[in-house]
Amino acid sequence: MAPPLRPLARLRPPGMLLRALLLLLLLSPLPGVWCFSELSFVKEPQDVTVTRKDPVVLDCQAHGEVPIKVTWLKNGAKMSENKRIEVLSNGSLYISEVEGRRGEQSDEGFYQCLAMNKYGAILSQKAHLALSTISAFEVQPISTEVHEGGVARFACKISSHPPAVITWEFNRTTLPMTMDRITALPTGVLQIYDVSQRDSGNYRCIAATVAHRRKSMEASLTVIPAKESKSFHTPTIIAGPQNITTSLHQTVVLECMATGNPKPIISWSRLDHKSIDVFNTRVLGNGNLMISDVRLQHAGVYVCRATTPGTRNFTVAMATLTVLAPPSFVEWPESLTRPRAGTARFVCQAEGIPSPKMSWLKNGRKIHSNGRIKMYNSKLVINQIIPEDDAIYQCMAENSQGSILSRARLTVVMSEDRPSAPYNVHAETMSSSAILLAWERPLYNSDKVIAYSVHYMKAEGLNNEEYQVVIGNDTTHYIIDDLEPASNYTFYIVAYMPMGASQMSDHVTQNTLEDVPLRPPEISLTSRSPTDILISWLPIPAKYRRGQVVLYRLSFRLSTENSIQVLELPGTTHEYLLEGLKPDSVYLVRITAATRVGLGESSVWTSHRTPKATSVKAPKSPELHLEPLNCTTISVRWQQDVEDTAAIQGYKLYYKEEGQQENGPIFLDTKDLLYTLSGLDPRRKYHVRLLAYNNIDDGYQADQTVSTPGCVSVRDRMVPPPPPPHHLYAKANTSSSIFLHWRRPAFTAAQIINYTIRCNPVGLQNASLVLYLQTSETHMLVQGLEPNTKYEFAVRLHVDQLSSPWSPVVYHSTLPEAPAGPPVGVKVTLIEDDTALVSWKPPDGPETVVTRYTILYASRKAWIAGEWQVLHREGAITMALLENLVAGNVYIVKISASNEVGEGPFSNSVELAVLPKETSESNQRPKRLDSADAKVYSGYYHLDQKSMTGIAVGVGIALTCILICVLILIYRSKARKSSASKTAQNGTQQLPRTSASLASGNEVGKNLEGAVGNEESLMPMIMPNSFIDAKGGTDLIINSYGPIIKNNSKKKWFFFQDSKKIQVEQPQRRFTPAVCFYQPGTTVLISDEDSPSSPGQTTSFSRPFGVAADTEHSANSEGSHETGDSGRFSHESNDEIHLSSVISTTPPNL
């Protein structure tokens, strides 16, 4: 049966259909005004890691009114498409083959997409495109030996991106992790407990990423059989937790591995006594703490404690877990609608670790502050809104963990019946600080104008402040004063009516006239020699220059005279050298700058003393730099001349306010190159001078002046912040602690005050390592610091939910650790019968600081009785003299190093045997050398036994050869004389008389007359010098006490004299002991060789002493030239050195 037919629908009237159609149109998503929605991102690019030659797609999809154009930026610069890089239809970026560092152009970097439509543009978050990389192993397993039943630990460390997965192999096979006593930590550590013989073998780790795989070196584990009975020992943590910095949602492991008998129990706690999160935390292996899905609340200090069961014996180790978090918004900017000439304020706040950096964008471009637009930490303020300000604004928060953006739109509403802009604006310069501005009334609705506003700002530079002046409608000109001289300004005018403001007028730019400089340059004075002063100065800041400096006038005079000498220098000059001055005199110097208008104010007289004229080499003046840090603090920096070879013991710093007494000296160490002067007065001029000094005298000083600026008031605060603590004082307590003390600010309204101390090493780059400590006292002992490290400290106070600024920074160094080792290379050399020279080298270790050495020496008899003789030397000296030694004894010598913290261990004992004196030699050698003489002889006579033997053999051979030659010459001379006599008797020839003048003595000339055929044999065979060396030797005569240069006075050679006279005079010739005088100040050794009873036969020898002249000895003497103060000996560090004469004897062979 067919279904019944449905009744036909009733026809609706046309009016109802029309209303339904209109409702459908209103609800339909039509384009244009009907479907307007703000521009936003549906998908943004994300961080990605790829391998070379792989394709990659960075997503970017925007939503809003079409058409939407998408462009891409890489590292802030616009990208262009090519064969490899293409922007897809949905806005995403496609790279077909990623190029790495080896290619011509790397694709690594930060990418952002920019979406734009007719309402504005927005910028996406940053996405980092990185290549998969892996480095070489930073830490590899090390072979070890472990007792059976003990614990073994191997470690691997490697840097890679993404992080590598580390596994372990045992004897080249994968190490199973099924046993509880073996634990492999994700950080690359392998732990083995209850080691047995089956664990012996080779271990290595394997690091693998998606694209790389590396194997470490093998390390062997040797198991030593255990003893039958194990002795008790307290727990020891052999691998404690390390400080870790991680990101949110990562997994971290805090290692804690301990040994002991019995096996210790390992427990974990937090230093702040908070409970450990049990849901995301578990113990891995035998005591390692693993935290998964790390959150901000997991940050803190964790303490590992190893305890002996059933006892209170325990040991602890701790580490800090720092959790970094990407930025997140706390407050978002909201879209605004404002009229023309109104003010718009956007507020945006974000948090993160580390604190994010805030910036603002307009249509995807970074905003820079100017007169109308100002940016604070969390605000964007736009004054005097113009139509061009209608745009989309974004707040961007960025830190090391990422970036986020939030957007808002500013809509500018314009009134239809507003007046037109003022026109025909022009400016005229009136003076160095005033400009006249004039304009015409608006062409339309000028009768409705109720006021004008004049806007002006500096034309040069960024972040210039814009100023506004409101005047009535009854005038069309205005004089703007209080302007800066020699500056360009930009002006525009706005007209106001009850319905709103007009458009801006055209901009005009005009400059002010020049003026005289507001203040003089700040000068620096140094000396390079005792007769000059180098005057240098910095250019005057533009704020105070007030024009172009064309001239400097330099004035100087002696402090004891009234006459002033004046020099005029070009405006491009910034230093001048005054020469021809008097040494050790005080000079006064001042300077004046001038522009085209005229001279400005002169500086105050600055004094400088020229150095003394002395032969002692004093340290040169350091290069000094002063910089005001704030209105009460000046940073003093300096640098010593690298070419300065003078020894420096430290620095002296003086400073004074202009017209006040000088403060100082402040003694600074040689390592200090920075000092902060705090607690100064604002807007004051200070004079600072610095010099280097040593144990001899002060060096050349550097003088400089600097002015402190005025204090700037804190803006945008209803309640002013409290003042910071002052008079912060630091003093080193130990090598790992510094005591701080400060004063409370002078206010008593609040009773409860807390302080925060900031502490970090100078030059620290990682901000997460800065230490913050809390206290309610005005003093604190900061512990756990590194030895011999310079730290900076600052303090701020907290009261009534307000925090003060940080106090001026104070720098101080921890004390060094006591020397851990003894001096090395100890050597003892006998240089006289009763004097020995001991030398050494500083203890090993670059961080070892030595301020004093202690030398203990004693004979064996005294050593057995415990009686030591003690000498002390400064840390810069590495040698000393041991005097008054007794012959026939064996001496024991040992040395230790010490500093202000403590004394290090003594070196191994070194023995020195002093041989008994021989009677024949005892009368010919000096009995004793004092300290001053030893200083001279140490450069020449530091010879060992082998060297003395070689010299003696050489001298003996030389004397034998000379004696043979003399005998041969005498024999030949007799033969020739006999032949000449016979020839004279025969009357055949006659000798020219000129030949006789070549011989020494009249007697020889008479005997040689008449020799004709043997003229050449009558020439002297030896020149007046001691000898002739064809190899370029010197006329040096060496005896057992060192080298002596013979005088060049003429002598009579024996073989030129008559043989009869020789026989008569030979018995009368004798050698007397030579006397050597050491004359203080001349350093010359004088030897009188002949007896005072035989005048006319005197032959003197002289030789100036100096280490530099002994080129041969410097290659063979060890320890005598290691310091610049070598030879500066005394029994005590404060003994005076007396220079005395030394009586010496000349051996008979000379």
Swiss-Prot record:
The keyword Signal applies. InterPro entries: FN3_dom, FN3_sf, Ig-like_dom, Ig-like_dom_sf, Ig-like_fold, Ig_I-set, Ig_sub, Ig_sub2. Residues 981-1002, 1086-1150 are annotated as: Disordered. Disulfide bonds join C60-C113, C156-C205, C256-C304, C348-C395. GO terms for cellular component: extracellular space; plasma membrane. One of its GO terms (molecular function) is identical protein binding. Residues 36-130, 135-222, 235-322, 327-411 form the Ig-like domain. The lineage of its organism: Eukaryota, Metazoa, Chordata, Craniata, Vertebrata. Residues 36-949 are extracellular. Residues 1110-1138 have a biased composition (Basic and acidic residues). It is a single-pass membrane protein. Glycans are attached at N90, N488, N630. Residues 971-1150 are cytoplasmic. This is Protogenin. Residues 1-35 form the signal peptide. Residues 421-515, 517-613, 618-717, 724-817, 822-917 form the Fibronectin type-III domain. Residues 983-1000, 1092-1102, 1141-1150 have a biased composition (Polar residues). The chain crosses the membrane at residues 950-970. It is found in: Membrane. The keyword Glycoprotein applies. It comes from Homo sapiens. Belongs to the immunoglobulin superfamily. DCC family. Keywords: Developmental protein, Disulfide bond, Glycoprotein, Immunoglobulin domain, Membrane, Repeat, Signal, Transmembrane, Transmembrane helix. May play a role in anteroposterior axis elongation. GO terms for biological process: cell-cell adhesion; negative regulation of neurogenesis.
